[in-house]
């Protein structure tokens, strides 16, 4: 299964934001062990670095990003993806970019701590980490 992790799931894990961090960490482990194919949107990587550097320092943020780049594939953000996101009628441009970026790499699902932010979309399911773990049989 091809999964795109929302920025909030990764931040939950890296910043130990309870109660969401445990399920998110298990999803990331499932990707790392090959149980699922994992993707991060390119914008997620820069956001993760920025926010974790503010919280835990630049060196730690760089280590986190390096680790993520070893585990996950990166879904691109191009001009066409940004244009599609702008005309998507989504209430949040960040979520629209994640969705369109994931669509470009044929993801099956988005894993997010807040599934209500994403509108219903054809072909891509939206799941909380605990739900995707059940689907994966973890």
Annotate each PLM feature.
Residues 7, 44, 112:
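Ser/Thr-centric signal marking residues that sit
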Residues 62-66, 82-83:
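Short, well-structured alpha-helical segments
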Residues 40-44, 81:
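Short, conserved alpha-helical segments within structured domains
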Residues 1-40, 53-63, 120, 127-138:
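Short, well-structured N-terminal submotif of metal-dependent ribonuclease cores
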Residues 75-77, 126-129:
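Short acidic-hydrophobic, aromatic-tinged amphipathic segments that line or gate anion-handling sites
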Residues 70-116:
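Active-site neighborhoods of divalent-metal-dependent phosphate/nucleic-acid chemistry enzymes
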